[in-house]
From Swiss-Prot:
The gene is MT-CYB. Its main location: mitochondrion. The cytochrome bc1 complex contains 3 respiratory subunits (MT-CYB, CYC1 and UQCRFS1), 2 core proteins (UQCRC1 and UQCRC2) and probably 6 low-molecular weight proteins. Keywords: Electron transport, Heme, Iron, Membrane, Metal-binding, Mitochondrion, Mitochondrion inner membrane, Respiratory chain, Transmembrane, Transmembrane helix, Transport, Ubiquinone. Belongs to the cytochrome b family. This is Cytochrome b. GO terms for cellular component: mitochondrial inner membrane; respiratory chain complex III. It comes from Naja annulata annulata (Banded water cobra).
Amino acid sequence: MSNQHTLLMSNLLPVGSNISTWWNFGSMLLTCLMLQITTGFFLAIHYTANINLAFSSVIHITRDVPYGWIMQNLHAISASMFFICIYIHIARGLYYGLYLNKEVWLSGTALLITLMATAFFGYVLPWGQMSFWAATVITNLLTAIPYLGTMLTTWLWGGFSINDPTLTRFFALHFILPFAIMALSSIHIILLHNEGSNNPLGTNSDIDKIPFHPYHSYKDMLMFTSMITLLFITLSFSPDLLNYPENFSKANPLVTPQHIKPEWYFLFAYGILRSIPNKLGGALALLMSVMILTTVPFTHTSYTRSMMFRPLSQILFWTLMATFITITWTASKPVEPPFISISQTTSIFYFSFFITIPLLGWTENKIMMMNN
Protein backbone atom coordinates (compact mmCIF):
# COMPACT_ATOMS: atom_id res chain seq x y z
CA MET A 1 0.00 0.00 0.00
CA SER A 2 1.39 3.44 -0.99
CA ASN A 3 2.12 6.19 1.54
CA GLN A 4 -0.81 8.18 0.17
CA HIS A 5 -3.25 5.32 0.84
CA THR A 6 -1.80 4.79 4.33
CA LEU A 7 -2.34 8.48 5.06
CA LEU A 8 -5.90 8.25 3.79
CA MET A 9 -6.66 5.21 5.95
CA SER A 10 -5.12 6.65 9.12
CA ASN A 11 -6.58 10.16 8.86
CA LEU A 12 -9.90 9.32 7.12
CA LEU A 13 -9.44 12.32 4.81
CA PRO A 14 -6.35 14.53 4.75
CA VAL A 15 -7.20 18.15 3.90
CA GLY A 16 -5.06 21.28 3.47
CA SER A 17 -4.64 23.04 6.81
CA ASN A 18 -5.35 26.51 5.43
CA ILE A 19 -8.80 26.09 3.83
CA SER A 20 -11.07 28.91 5.00
CA THR A 21 -14.76 29.28 5.91
CA TRP A 22 -15.60 29.62 2.19
CA TRP A 23 -14.98 25.85 1.96
CA ASN A 24 -17.87 25.12 4.37
CA PHE A 25 -20.65 25.83 1.90
CA GLY A 26 -20.48 22.38 0.26
CA SER A 27 -21.51 20.67 3.50
CA MET A 28 -24.16 23.39 4.05
CA LEU A 29 -25.60 22.57 0.62
CA LEU A 30 -25.81 18.91 1.60
CA THR A 31 -27.67 19.94 4.78
CA CYS A 32 -30.10 22.03 2.70
CA LEU A 33 -30.71 19.07 0.36
CA MET A 34 -31.49 16.72 3.26
CA LEU A 35 -33.81 19.35 4.75
CA GLN A 36 -35.60 19.86 1.42
CA ILE A 37 -36.12 16.14 0.82
CA THR A 38 -37.42 15.58 4.37
CA THR A 39 -39.85 18.53 4.42
CA GLY A 40 -40.81 17.89 0.78
CA PHE A 41 -41.81 14.31 1.59
CA PHE A 42 -44.17 15.44 4.36
CA LEU A 43 -45.65 18.14 2.12
CA ALA A 44 -46.16 15.65 -0.75
CA ILE A 45 -48.23 13.44 1.59
CA HIS A 46 -50.86 16.19 1.91
CA TYR A 47 -50.51 17.96 -1.45
CA THR A 48 -53.00 17.38 -4.30
CA ALA A 49 -51.73 17.87 -7.87
CA ASN A 50 -55.00 19.16 -9.32
CA ILE A 51 -55.60 22.71 -10.58
CA ASN A 52 -58.86 22.97 -8.62
CA LEU A 53 -57.43 21.57 -5.36
CA ALA A 54 -53.69 22.44 -5.34
CA PHE A 55 -54.10 25.95 -3.88
CA SER A 56 -56.60 24.70 -1.28
CA SER A 57 -54.32 21.77 -0.34
CA VAL A 58 -51.43 24.18 0.40
CA ILE A 59 -53.76 26.25 2.62
CA HIS A 60 -54.93 23.00 4.26
CA ILE A 61 -51.28 22.07 5.01
CA THR A 62 -50.56 25.44 6.66
CA ARG A 63 -53.83 25.63 8.62
CA ASP A 64 -54.99 22.12 9.48
CA VAL A 65 -52.01 19.72 9.33
CA PRO A 66 -50.15 19.55 12.68
CA TYR A 67 -46.89 21.51 12.23
CA GLY A 68 -47.74 21.83 8.53
CA TRP A 69 -46.95 25.56 8.58
CA ILE A 70 -43.42 24.73 9.80
CA MET A 71 -42.94 22.16 7.02
CA GLN A 72 -44.28 24.49 4.32
CA ASN A 73 -42.31 27.58 5.42
CA LEU A 74 -39.15 25.58 6.12
CA HIS A 75 -39.34 24.08 2.62
CA ALA A 76 -39.75 27.54 1.03
CA ILE A 77 -37.11 29.34 3.15
CA SER A 78 -34.50 26.57 2.90
CA ALA A 79 -34.93 26.68 -0.91
CA SER A 80 -33.74 30.29 -0.73
CA MET A 81 -30.96 29.25 1.66
CA PHE A 82 -29.99 26.51 -0.84
CA PHE A 83 -29.51 29.10 -3.59
CA ILE A 84 -27.65 31.56 -1.33
CA CYS A 85 -25.21 28.75 -0.46
CA ILE A 86 -24.81 27.55 -4.05
CA TYR A 87 -24.17 31.07 -5.41
CA ILE A 88 -21.51 31.64 -2.71
CA HIS A 89 -20.09 28.17 -3.50
CA ILE A 90 -19.80 29.08 -7.22
CA ALA A 91 -18.34 32.53 -6.46
CA ARG A 92 -15.73 30.86 -4.23
CA GLY A 93 -14.86 28.50 -7.10
CA LEU A 94 -14.43 31.42 -9.52
CA TYR A 95 -12.31 33.45 -7.08
CA TYR A 96 -9.94 30.69 -6.01
CA GLY A 97 -9.62 29.00 -9.43
CA LEU A 98 -11.26 25.74 -8.32
CA TYR A 99 -12.73 25.38 -11.82
CA LEU A 100 -9.35 24.02 -12.98
CA ASN A 101 -10.48 20.71 -11.49
CA LYS A 102 -12.61 20.33 -14.63
CA GLU A 103 -14.63 17.21 -13.76
CA VAL A 104 -15.73 18.67 -10.41
CA TRP A 105 -16.64 22.04 -11.95
CA LEU A 106 -18.63 20.56 -14.85
CA SER A 107 -20.52 18.14 -12.57
CA GLY A 108 -21.25 21.14 -10.31
CA THR A 109 -22.66 23.10 -13.27
CA ALA A 110 -24.91 20.12 -14.11
CA LEU A 111 -26.01 20.15 -10.47
CA LEU A 112 -26.87 23.87 -10.67
CA ILE A 113 -29.01 23.36 -13.80
CA THR A 114 -30.84 20.41 -12.19
CA LEU A 115 -31.41 22.44 -9.02
CA MET A 116 -32.81 25.40 -10.99
CA ALA A 117 -35.19 23.08 -12.87
CA THR A 118 -36.33 21.48 -9.59
CA ALA A 119 -36.94 24.87 -7.97
CA PHE A 120 -38.87 26.11 -11.01
CA PHE A 121 -41.19 23.09 -10.98
CA GLY A 122 -41.69 23.53 -7.23
CA TYR A 123 -42.62 27.21 -7.65
CA VAL A 124 -45.52 26.22 -9.92
CA LEU A 125 -47.02 23.67 -7.49
CA PRO A 126 -48.94 26.00 -5.09
CA TRP A 127 -50.90 27.16 -8.18
CA GLY A 128 -50.94 30.78 -7.05
CA GLN A 129 -51.31 33.66 -9.48
CA MET A 130 -47.55 34.25 -9.86
CA SER A 131 -46.87 30.48 -10.04
CA PHE A 132 -49.23 30.13 -12.99
CA TRP A 133 -48.00 33.15 -14.94
CA ALA A 134 -44.30 32.47 -14.30
CA ALA A 135 -44.85 28.92 -15.61
CA THR A 136 -46.70 30.28 -18.66
CA VAL A 137 -43.97 32.79 -19.54
CA ILE A 138 -40.96 30.49 -18.97
CA THR A 139 -42.36 27.33 -20.62
CA ASN A 140 -43.55 29.45 -23.55
CA LEU A 141 -39.87 30.16 -24.34
CA LEU A 142 -39.65 26.63 -25.77
CA THR A 143 -41.75 27.84 -28.72
CA ALA A 144 -38.73 29.96 -29.77
CA ILE A 145 -36.88 26.74 -30.76
CA PRO A 146 -37.11 26.46 -34.58
CA TYR A 147 -39.19 23.55 -35.99
CA LEU A 148 -39.51 21.63 -32.68
CA GLY A 149 -40.61 24.45 -30.37
CA THR A 150 -44.40 24.14 -30.62
CA MET A 151 -44.29 20.33 -30.36
CA LEU A 152 -42.02 20.46 -27.27
CA THR A 153 -44.24 23.06 -25.57
CA THR A 154 -47.40 21.03 -26.23
CA TRP A 155 -45.63 17.92 -24.90
CA LEU A 156 -44.49 19.73 -21.75
CA TRP A 157 -47.92 21.26 -21.12
CA GLY A 158 -49.76 18.02 -21.87
CA GLY A 159 -52.17 20.01 -24.03
CA PHE A 160 -52.55 23.37 -25.76
CA SER A 161 -52.32 25.43 -22.58
CA ILE A 162 -51.08 25.09 -19.00
CA ASN A 163 -53.67 22.90 -17.33
CA ASP A 164 -54.17 19.86 -15.09
CA PRO A 165 -51.72 17.55 -16.96
CA THR A 166 -49.03 20.28 -16.66
CA LEU A 167 -49.40 20.47 -12.88
CA THR A 168 -49.34 16.66 -12.57
CA ARG A 169 -46.12 16.27 -14.55
CA PHE A 170 -44.50 19.24 -12.79
CA PHE A 171 -45.26 17.59 -9.45
CA ALA A 172 -43.81 14.28 -10.69
CA LEU A 173 -40.66 16.05 -11.91
CA HIS A 174 -40.33 18.07 -8.70
CA PHE A 175 -40.54 14.84 -6.71
CA ILE A 176 -38.02 12.84 -8.77
CA LEU A 177 -35.36 15.49 -9.51
CA PRO A 178 -34.05 15.82 -5.91
CA PHE A 179 -32.97 12.18 -6.17
CA ALA A 180 -31.11 13.05 -9.39
CA ILE A 181 -29.49 15.90 -7.41
CA MET A 182 -28.45 13.37 -4.74
CA ALA A 183 -26.87 11.14 -7.40
CA LEU A 184 -25.07 14.08 -9.03
CA SER A 185 -23.90 15.30 -5.59
CA SER A 186 -22.37 11.87 -4.93
CA ILE A 187 -20.53 12.03 -8.28
CA HIS A 188 -19.43 15.61 -7.49
CA ILE A 189 -18.00 14.57 -4.08
CA ILE A 190 -16.30 11.43 -5.47
CA LEU A 191 -14.65 13.47 -8.24
CA LEU A 192 -13.56 16.11 -5.70
CA HIS A 193 -11.93 13.55 -3.40
CA ASN A 194 -10.21 11.94 -6.36
CA GLU A 195 -7.87 14.93 -6.51
CA GLY A 196 -8.57 16.59 -3.14
CA SER A 197 -9.67 20.08 -2.16
CA ASN A 198 -7.68 23.09 -3.27
CA ASN A 199 -6.81 25.95 -0.89
CA PRO A 200 -7.01 29.78 -0.90
CA LEU A 201 -3.40 30.12 -2.10
CA GLY A 202 -4.05 27.87 -5.12
CA THR A 203 -0.93 25.84 -4.27
CA ASN A 204 -0.46 22.10 -3.78
CA SER A 205 -1.63 21.09 -0.28
CA ASP A 206 0.30 17.78 -0.10
CA ILE A 207 3.09 19.17 2.13
CA ASP A 208 0.69 20.51 4.78
CA LYS A 209 -2.36 18.31 5.38
CA ILE A 210 -4.33 17.64 8.55
CA PRO A 211 -7.17 15.17 9.27
CA PHE A 212 -10.60 16.40 8.22
CA HIS A 213 -11.99 15.23 11.56
CA PRO A 214 -11.96 16.88 14.07
CA TYR A 215 -10.35 20.06 12.67
CA HIS A 216 -12.56 20.83 9.67
CA SER A 217 -15.64 18.84 10.75
CA TYR A 218 -16.06 21.19 13.74
CA LYS A 219 -15.85 24.19 11.39
CA ASP A 220 -18.59 22.57 9.29
CA MET A 221 -20.73 22.05 12.40
CA LEU A 222 -20.35 25.72 13.39
CA MET A 223 -21.53 26.92 9.96
CA PHE A 224 -24.30 24.31 9.94
CA THR A 225 -25.51 25.54 13.37
CA SER A 226 -25.36 29.19 12.21
CA MET A 227 -27.39 28.36 9.09
CA ILE A 228 -30.06 26.42 11.01
CA THR A 229 -30.29 29.28 13.56
CA LEU A 230 -30.78 31.84 10.77
CA LEU A 231 -33.32 29.53 9.12
CA PHE A 232 -35.42 29.21 12.28
CA ILE A 233 -35.19 32.94 13.10
CA THR A 234 -36.58 33.70 9.62
CA LEU A 235 -39.19 30.94 10.00
CA SER A 236 -40.35 32.28 13.38
CA PHE A 237 -40.37 36.04 12.74
CA SER A 238 -40.67 36.60 8.97
CA PRO A 239 -41.87 33.37 7.31
CA ASP A 240 -43.21 35.25 4.26
CA LEU A 241 -40.14 37.45 3.84
CA LEU A 242 -39.28 36.04 0.39
CA ASN A 243 -42.83 35.33 -0.85
CA TYR A 244 -44.71 37.56 -3.30
CA PRO A 245 -48.16 38.86 -2.22
CA GLU A 246 -49.46 38.00 -5.72
CA ASN A 247 -48.92 34.29 -5.02
CA PHE A 248 -51.39 34.32 -2.12
CA SER A 249 -54.19 34.53 -4.72
CA LYS A 250 -55.34 31.46 -6.61
CA ALA A 251 -54.21 31.22 -10.25
CA ASN A 252 -56.54 33.01 -12.64
CA PRO A 253 -55.75 32.60 -16.37
CA LEU A 254 -58.05 35.55 -17.19
CA VAL A 255 -56.16 38.13 -15.09
CA THR A 256 -52.55 38.94 -15.94
CA PRO A 257 -50.44 40.32 -13.06
CA GLN A 258 -49.05 43.82 -13.63
CA HIS A 259 -45.51 42.51 -13.30
CA ILE A 260 -44.61 38.82 -13.79
CA LYS A 261 -41.49 37.67 -11.97
CA PRO A 262 -40.13 34.32 -10.72
CA GLU A 263 -38.53 33.67 -7.31
CA TRP A 264 -35.64 35.98 -6.34
CA TYR A 265 -32.98 33.32 -7.05
CA PHE A 266 -33.95 33.21 -10.74
CA LEU A 267 -34.08 36.99 -11.18
CA PHE A 268 -30.51 37.32 -12.52
CA ALA A 269 -31.30 34.92 -15.40
CA TYR A 270 -34.79 36.45 -15.86
CA GLY A 271 -33.23 39.94 -15.99
CA ILE A 272 -30.88 38.82 -18.78
CA LEU A 273 -33.83 37.23 -20.64
CA ARG A 274 -35.90 40.40 -20.30
CA SER A 275 -33.10 42.72 -21.44
CA ILE A 276 -33.20 41.33 -25.01
CA PRO A 277 -36.28 42.42 -27.02
CA ASN A 278 -36.34 39.21 -29.05
CA LYS A 279 -37.84 35.88 -28.01
CA LEU A 280 -35.17 33.53 -29.41
CA GLY A 281 -32.32 35.89 -28.45
CA GLY A 282 -33.70 36.19 -24.91
CA ALA A 283 -34.12 32.41 -24.57
CA LEU A 284 -30.52 31.83 -25.75
CA ALA A 285 -29.20 34.51 -23.36
CA LEU A 286 -31.14 32.89 -20.50
CA LEU A 287 -29.57 29.52 -21.31
CA MET A 288 -26.10 31.03 -21.75
CA SER A 289 -26.29 32.88 -18.40
CA VAL A 290 -25.79 29.50 -16.71
CA MET A 291 -24.07 27.48 -19.45
CA ILE A 292 -21.25 30.06 -19.77
CA LEU A 293 -19.90 28.70 -16.47
CA THR A 294 -18.82 25.56 -18.37
CA THR A 295 -16.38 27.64 -20.47
CA VAL A 296 -14.37 28.97 -17.49
CA PRO A 297 -11.99 25.95 -17.04
CA PHE A 298 -11.03 26.11 -20.73
CA THR A 299 -10.33 29.87 -20.87
CA HIS A 300 -8.02 30.17 -17.83
CA THR A 301 -4.80 31.84 -18.99
CA SER A 302 -3.13 33.09 -15.79
CA TYR A 303 -0.02 31.38 -14.39
CA THR A 304 -1.57 31.80 -10.93
CA ARG A 305 -4.56 29.64 -10.04
CA SER A 306 -6.18 31.77 -7.32
CA MET A 307 -7.18 35.45 -7.62
CA MET A 308 -5.68 36.05 -4.18
CA PHE A 309 -2.51 37.56 -5.71
CA ARG A 310 -4.16 39.08 -8.82
CA PRO A 311 -5.55 42.54 -7.91
CA LEU A 312 -6.77 43.31 -11.45
CA SER A 313 -8.76 40.05 -11.58
CA GLN A 314 -10.13 40.80 -8.10
CA ILE A 315 -11.55 44.12 -9.34
CA LEU A 316 -13.20 42.28 -12.26
CA PHE A 317 -14.55 39.57 -9.94
CA TRP A 318 -16.17 42.06 -7.54
CA THR A 319 -17.59 43.92 -10.56
CA LEU A 320 -19.25 40.62 -11.53
CA MET A 321 -20.70 40.29 -7.99
CA ALA A 322 -22.09 43.86 -8.15
CA THR A 323 -23.46 43.12 -11.64
CA PHE A 324 -25.19 39.95 -10.40
CA ILE A 325 -26.90 41.87 -7.56
CA THR A 326 -27.89 44.75 -9.88
CA ILE A 327 -29.44 42.39 -12.47
CA THR A 328 -31.39 40.68 -9.67
CA TRP A 329 -32.65 44.06 -8.44
CA THR A 330 -33.67 45.38 -11.89
CA ALA A 331 -35.45 42.12 -12.77
CA SER A 332 -37.69 42.61 -9.72
CA LYS A 333 -38.84 45.98 -11.12
CA PRO A 334 -41.43 46.68 -13.86
CA VAL A 335 -40.32 46.81 -17.52
CA GLU A 336 -39.96 50.59 -17.77
CA PRO A 337 -37.17 53.21 -17.87
CA PRO A 338 -34.61 53.39 -16.30
CA PHE A 339 -34.75 49.65 -15.42
CA ILE A 340 -34.66 48.55 -19.08
CA SER A 341 -31.35 50.32 -19.82
CA ILE A 342 -29.82 49.31 -16.45
CA SER A 343 -30.77 45.67 -17.12
CA GLN A 344 -29.26 45.76 -20.63
CA THR A 345 -26.03 47.39 -19.40
CA THR A 346 -25.56 44.93 -16.53
CA SER A 347 -26.30 41.97 -18.85
CA ILE A 348 -23.45 43.14 -21.12
CA PHE A 349 -21.19 43.45 -18.04
CA TYR A 350 -22.16 39.93 -16.90
CA PHE A 351 -21.09 38.26 -20.16
CA SER A 352 -18.10 40.61 -20.54
CA PHE A 353 -16.56 39.14 -17.39
CA PHE A 354 -16.17 35.71 -19.02
CA ILE A 355 -14.62 37.28 -22.15
CA THR A 356 -12.34 39.73 -20.29
CA ILE A 357 -10.92 37.42 -17.59
CA PRO A 358 -8.73 35.34 -20.02
CA LEU A 359 -7.38 38.58 -21.57
CA LEU A 360 -6.67 39.96 -18.11
CA GLY A 361 -4.88 36.69 -17.25
CA TRP A 362 -2.49 37.24 -20.17
CA THR A 363 -1.94 40.86 -19.10
CA GLU A 364 -1.12 39.80 -15.54
CA ASN A 365 1.33 37.19 -16.85
CA LYS A 366 3.13 39.91 -18.85
CA ILE A 367 3.27 42.20 -15.78
CA MET A 368 4.70 39.39 -13.63
CA MET A 369 7.32 38.55 -16.27
CA MET A 370 8.31 42.23 -16.53
CA ASN A 371 8.73 42.43 -12.73
CA ASN A 372 10.87 39.29 -12.75
